[in-house]
């Protein structure tokens, strides 16, 4: 890396699954700066009690925490309406001079909805009830789809096993897995 390049912060695989009226969201704990693992147990999952939701983030931690706080404010302002709050956050994120510089993505699950919220104004509700963000997201997503299709595992078990598979493949994902359930 030459002096003019900033080391790229890489971290996170976050995966959420809805199955049989239950939702689980989990993440690994690894944070990497450049080619170096700097932390093994980063907390990337947050439960929003008053709305019965679980959120997870990928990207810069300070940016993500700022966005999670804003999302919580939107949920309170809109009476816990998940989709409306997500759209309003995405709108603010895209148009606000300060917020649009934030580099993070959010994954949100409730017992019946799963959303990905991005800084480009996207609010994505996957058709299969699986959300995945971060460095190892495509590995975890692939594993989760296979486990849903070919097993009777619970949402929590699918998230856990899929994150383990991602950790075996992605160098930016570890096996210090935290899973929450609603």
Swiss-Prot record:
Active site: 12
Pfam family for this entry, one: Proteasome
Cellular compartment(s): Cytoplasm
GO MF terms held by the record: metal ion binding; threonine-type endopeptidase activity
GO biological process per UniProt: proteolysis involved in protein catabolic process
Organism: Prosthecochloris aestuarii (strain DSM 271 / SK 413)
Subunit structure as annotated in this protein's UniProt entry: A double ring-shaped homohexamer of HslV is capped on each side by a ring-shaped HslU homohexamer. The assembly of the HslU/HslV complex is dependent on binding of ATP.
Gene that encodes it: hslV
Functional summary from the UniProt entry: Protease subunit of a proteasome-like degradation complex believed to be a general protein degrading machinery.
Protein's recorded name: ATP-dependent protease subunit HslV
Binding site for Na(+): 167, 170, 173
Entry-linked HAMAP family: HslV (MF_00248)
Alphabetical list of NCBIfam families matching this protein: ATP_dep_HslV, PRK05456.1
Catalyzed reaction equations: ATP-dependent cleavage of peptide bonds with broad specificity
This enzyme's EC code(s): 3.4.25.2
Cellular component, GO annotation: HslUV protease complex; proteasome core complex
Keywords, comma-separated and alphabetical: Allosteric enzyme, Cytoplasm, Hydrolase, Metal-binding, Protease, Sodium, Threonine protease
Family, similarity comment: Belongs to the peptidase T1B family. HslV subfamily.
Keyword Hydrolase tagged: yes
Residue pairs linked by disulfide bridges in the UniProt entry: none
Signal peptide range in chain numbering: none
Activity regulation text: Allosterically activated by HslU binding.
């Amino acid at each position: 890396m030459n002096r003019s390049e900033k080391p790229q912060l890489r971290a996170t695989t976050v995966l959420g699954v809805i199955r049989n009226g239950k939702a689980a969201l989990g993440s690994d704990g690894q944070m990497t700066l450049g080619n170096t693992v700097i932390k093994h147990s980063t907390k990337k999952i947050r439960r929003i009690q008053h709305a019965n939701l679980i959120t997870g983030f990928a990207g810069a931690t300070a940016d993500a925490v700022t966005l999670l706080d804003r999302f919580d404010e939107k949920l309170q302002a809109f009476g816990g309406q998940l989709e409306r709050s997500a759209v309003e956050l995405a709108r603010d994120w895209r148009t606000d001079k300060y917020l649009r510089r934030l580099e993070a993505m959010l994954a949100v699950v409730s017992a019946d909805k799963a959303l990905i919220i991005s800084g480009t104004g996207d609010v994505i509700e996957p058709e299969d009830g699986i959300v995945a963000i971060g460095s190892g997201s495509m590995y975890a997503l692939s594993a989760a789809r296979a486990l849903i299709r070919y097993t009777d595992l619970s949402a929590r078990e699918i998230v856990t096993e899929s994150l383990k598979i991602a950790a075996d493949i992605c160098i930016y994902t570890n096996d210090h897995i935290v899973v929450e359930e609603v």
